[in-house]
Amino acid sequence: MLDLYPVQNLTVDQLEYEKNTRFLQPAWDWIKNGNEHILSSPLFPPFYALSIDYTWVAVFTFIDVFLCNVPFFKDAKIQKDRKVTWDLIKKSLKLQGWNQLLWIYPMALVQLIWVPDTELPILAPTVFEMLSQLAIFFLAFDFTYFWFHYINHKVKWLYRWCHSVHHMYSSPFAASAQHLHPFELFFVGTFITTIPWIFPTHCLTYWIWFFIAQSVSYEVHIGYDFPFALHRIFWFYSGAPAHDMHHLRPLTCFQPWFNYLDRLMGYHITYADLKKMTEAKFKKFGLYSAEDEKGLIKIN
């Protein structure tokens, strides 16, 4: 689909002018130089995406297992009474491995066979083009996934069959971000992959979108509230504390990245709000009944 990026029918002089005036052109030329055969391969997008996954998991697994008692990380831990152990991490990695064998690698093979090489444009995208498209992709995914997520919680048979797999963990950590039922992985992966198809999207914009979408999805699962976290700057951004709350109280904080829909619909709640509740309300707020969760597997 990236071949839909418009071909610029420019004269030599016009092309040189555009190359000299586009802010991202030096970076685009540097990225392409000598790497064309890799970047144009239909295998590049899936393995690029996997490399982002593996990096987040590797970094925060090291932090969770070996640095959890370092004061900086200990203070930033949201659910301080929950320790991330190697046994917990292995359970998530095992499911991720099966999901990759079921979906990721077969889809990579399909792309290798049927998808032509990506045509790498000569020109970089303009800054406005890239930023405006990334903003639209971000808003579109956040809005759409909110409703997918909301329905998965409100339709009980769907929750029990599909989304409860992700909620085996009430205290998330980076490796649990991809602890998903295959159906949910397919939906989320397909939407992240195809949403840029609504525009003629430059492949550089496409790759940056992949990085942002996956990184934000991991960031909200890390289980740490760092002093530099984005939610401390932008009130409309959920961040790790909101999604941590969602895992602890699964009928709250449905929106994945922003929080405006949760605020409008009364689902946004903080740990400070919990402390203000009466004991009776605290015991039930945002939780399923014991009957609703009967028979579901809980890992932590």
Curated annotation (Swiss-Prot):
Membrane disposition: Multi-pass membrane protein
Position of sequence motif Histidine box-1: 148-152
An annotated GO cellular component: endoplasmic reticulum membrane
GO function term, MF aspect, one: iron ion binding
Compartments where found: Membrane
Residues with glycosylation annotation: N9
Any Pfam family: FA_hydroxylase
Motif placement: Histidine box-2: 163-167
Record GO biological process: sterol biosynthetic process
Record keywords: Glycoprotein, Iron, Lipid biosynthesis, Lipid metabolism, Membrane, Metal-binding, Oxidoreductase, Steroid biosynthesis, Steroid metabolism, Sterol biosynthesis, Sterol metabolism, Transmembrane, Transmembrane helix
Cofactors required: Fe cation
Residue span of motif Histidine box-3: 242-248
EC number(s) reported in the record: 1.14.99.-
Keyword Iron attached: yes
Top-level taxonomic group: Eukaryota
Chain ranges passing through the membrane: 54-73, 95-115, 130-152, 192-212
Domain Fatty acid hydroxylase: 135-266
Top-level EC class as recorded in UniProt: oxidoreductase
Family: Belongs to the sterol desaturase family.
Stated role: Probable sterol desaturase.
Name of the protein described by the UniProt record: Cholesterol 25-hydroxylase-like protein
Organism: Caenorhabditis elegans
